[in-house]
């Protein structure tokens, strides 16, 4: 019996315990109820009664030795796993992760919406894929107007005698839809993307953002229009900005004007951006043509109104003193990071 205990002790001492799998195999072989140590305990009753206490003590030592090996191996493996993990120094300062922000076009558009909202304008939107009748006919464009040519407009589908489908060239069709659906008085702004078949340069792009405004009520005058534009320009560009109104022509307004502000780069002295004039155009405007009002089912003898439209992207250039409109569409993260809030 003593030889069996000694032999088993040598096996226990020599058994490799380098992994959790080794420990589990060791436990199943030696320390479980039907293991080798338990088998020796079952033979204890056949030992001479005078030797039984001594042999029983040796068996207990054998069992404790096996359990001690299991505990030591488990602790060693656990310590090794912990030491192999990367140490996190909680005293180090945290890393500031990059956070995105609104695109400069959206930032400026949001400010424009806020200004006009404070003046009482509601917001209206419409489809970018538009019908020829809404984009041209109802806005008093004659059939031979240059804007109807393929060189200026992206036509999606030519339908012969029916309505052509095109990418809208301005957000004015939204004004038409509003006048058809809502009774006056009407006071809305219409922001959105528009498309024109233009050469891409530092000052123009084939797709850009526009915001137009419409006010229909009784007794509306050009003086009301000027007051609105002056208020917007001073809030958007600063109270020291200078404006000028130049006579112009638009099929949907009469009289019509274009509005210029002093150049943001040269302060009115003349540079390449303003083409040495000292002025930059920011919008077109005018009194809504009676034909347009009548086309929308409103009596022009009773109701009058004004409309204006501006390129949001050009306003961004003015606001942030950017000299190339193409930068707004390139998604260059180096440029956009400058606008992180």
From Swiss-Prot:
GO terms, biological process: phenylalanyl-tRNA aminoacylation
Family that this chain belongs to: Belongs to the class-II aminoacyl-tRNA synthetase family. Phe-tRNA synthetase alpha subunit type 1 subfamily.
Keywords (A to Z) from UniProt: Aminoacyl-tRNA synthetase, ATP-binding, Cytoplasm, Ligase, Magnesium, Metal-binding, Nucleotide-binding, Protein biosynthesis
Reaction(s) catalysed (UniProt annotation): tRNA(Phe) + L-phenylalanine + ATP = L-phenylalanyl-tRNA(Phe) + AMP + diphosphate + H(+)
Pfam families: Phe_tRNA-synt_N, tRNA-synt_2d
Taxonomy, superkingdom: Bacteria
Name of this protein: Phenylalanine--tRNA ligase alpha subunit
Location(s) in or outside the cell: Cytoplasm
The enzyme's E.C. designation: 6.1.1.20
InterPro entries, per the entry: aa-tRNA-synth_II (IPR006195), aa-tRNA-synth_II/BPL/LPL (IPR045864), Phe-tRNA-synth_IIc_asu (IPR004529), Phe-tRNA_ligase_II_N (IPR004188), Phe_tRNA_ligase_alpha1_bac (IPR022911), Phenylalanyl-tRNA_Synthase (IPR002319), tRNA-bd_arm (IPR010978)
Oligomeric and partner information: Tetramer of two alpha and two beta subunits.
Main location, first listed in the record: cytoplasm
Cellular compartments per GO CC: cytoplasm
GO MF: ATP binding; magnesium ion binding; phenylalanine-tRNA ligase activity; tRNA binding
Known cofactor(s): Mg(2+)
Binding site for Mg(2+): 254
Free-text cofactor note: Binds 2 magnesium ions per tetramer.
Organism: Chlorobium phaeovibrioides (strain DSM 265 / 1930) (Prosthecochloris vibrioformis (strain DSM 265))
